[in-house]
Every structure is written in C-alpha cells, then in structure tokens.
A protein has these predicted regions:
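Generic detection of intrinsically disordered/low-complexity segments and helix-coil linkers/edges
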Residues: 2-5, 13, 42, 47, ...
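Helix-loop-helix hairpins in multi-pass membrane proteins, especially solute transporters
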Residues: 61-155
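Helix-boundary and loop/linker segments of multi-pass membrane transporters
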Residues: 1-7, 92-93
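Extracytoplasmic
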Residues: 6-64
Length: 155
C-alpha cells in the first residue's frame, strides 16, 4: 500500500505538468505577434508555431495509453516531463522560425503526454472513495490553465 501523502504528492506533480502543458498553448497564442517580430517570421509561417504544437499534441494523447502500458505511468510521465522541459528550453534558444516550429512539434508531442496520465492516475492511484475529489481537482486545473494564461503571457 502506498502512502496517501506520496500518492497525493505525485498526483499534484502530475496536475502541475498538465497545467504547464495547457498553459503553454495559450501563452504562446498570446505572444505570437511578438514572436513573429523577434524572429522575423512571416505571418503565413507564424501560425505553424501553434498548428505544429497542437497537431503533435493531438497525436500524442492517444499514444499515451500505449506508452503507459509499455513503460509504466511513472516513467512515461517522467520522460514526458523531461522532454517537455528540454523542448521548452530549446524553444527559448531558437533563432529562426523553422527551428522554432520544429521544436514546438517536439514540445507538443511531450505536452500531449502530460495530460492523460493525470486522469489515468485518478483510477490507478487514488482510492475509490477519493476519486471524485481527484477528478474534480484535475478538471479544475485543466480549466484554470487557459484562463490564467493571459495574465502570465503579459509577464
């Protein structure tokens, strides 16, 4: 039996990962104009920064179940977190539009792998009598992330 404190701590960390992945979508959407000016990206190419990320994320979400079965929930989530973090650093270091679009696709793949494990963990780790609370927390985190993005993009 796992310690309830460790289970909730792990669940909270997973919620934070999901929050950042969802937040990233909205923050970048808010900053697209500034990104385009900074990197001298044409308007028709600028949309690919978001499109590449979102397409990769949508592809990664259903693959997460397969990856979880192959590598376990813990290791898949850790790998996704490390990959997302490294891709985020890569995005910050990009000096061209093509490089940014490419790294955003990679970031989207890892970002997509940060969302489903939160809800999977509710049914695997959380005791049945606490699953409603955990699902509510996860849903609230998923809803608060895009809402809070506008103010964090301004920073």
């Amino acid at each position: 039996m796992k310690s309830p404190v460790l289970v909730w701590l792990g669940f909270s960390a997973m919620c934070l990962g999901m929050f950042v992945a969802i937040l990233d979508i909205q923050v970048v959407a808010s900053a697209l104009t500034n990104i385009g000016v900074s990197l001298d990206i044409a308007d028709d190419s600028l949309s690919w920064i978001q499109t590449g990320y979102l397409t990769a994320e949508v592809i990664a979400i259903p693959l997460t179940g397969l990856l979880t079965r192959a590598f376990t929930l813990r290791w898949m989530f850790v790998a996704a977190t490390v990959g997302f973090t490294l891709a985020s650093v890569g995005c910050a270091l990009c000096d061209s539009g093509a490089a940014l679009i490419t790294i955003r696709v990679v970031q989207g793949l890892f970002g997509g792998m940060l969302i489903p494990p939160v809800f999977t963990s509710v049914f695997i780790l959380i005791p049945k009598e606490r699953q409603l609370i955990a699902t509510t927390v996860a849903g609230a985190v998923a809803m608060i992330a895009p809402w809070s993005a506008r103010s964090s993009a301004a920073i």
